[in-house]
């Protein structure tokens, strides 16, 4: 079970818009994901339609949302307002814990489809490694086989949990989205993903600016060499490692900056220098402790009934 060929990174020079190119990661099933996506975590219902529309106008062709972000309908409105052809957009959502379980997950995907205004999704992830992940996964397998979802995966699954999901399911996860940034580089997790043919996505690529990420002198010095910002250096570092990055901004000029990273490459020595920044520690919290379970039980209660 769960045996298939590994994903492979590919370079695609098709233009998003004049002067912009993008690189892709090809999943085990052949589906290609743009290496830069627009993340909408913590973007309000009021701002989401404008932000998504502006991101698409800027050139993003990959949008990442989640049921627990409570902005799927507004993301759908932004997509509609942009006028983009649905086939030209890679759209991801994630299943929240309270929607786990076979029937619950099937129903929740149907709700997400309606909110997003689409009849299919490019990628659906299990958002957290808790509760009935196996029932939820079998629902995603069914929807994948039915053609409702083009690719399926997980988020925040540590190496042992990912190995378990790969080994004991008919269809192995194609993606694992985890916190990845210069201070928490996920080296061991990455090795495990590559071994098992799972592509990596990075949430919080800037660590939400904590620990003075944007003024880090090492990253700033590298940026000066290339005429790029610290944010652009981080995103290039991720994409050169064939990791899909999901930056977020509500400002159009920052959206443009975050997308404009494929016109330079970091040298091997620069990549090695950045590797030296790794603390091997989450900038937020771990997901594999009893306290983490308690935290997410609290989140489920807190978010119950919200739309």
PLM regions: where:
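N-terminal binding-site loop/beta-alpha segment at the start of enzyme catalytic domains
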Residues: 4-89, 206, 302-307
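Short, well-ordered amphipathic alpha-helices
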Residues: 73-80, 109-113, 140-141, 162
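CE4/NodB-like, metal-dependent polysaccharide N-deacetylase domain
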Residues: 105-125, 142-146
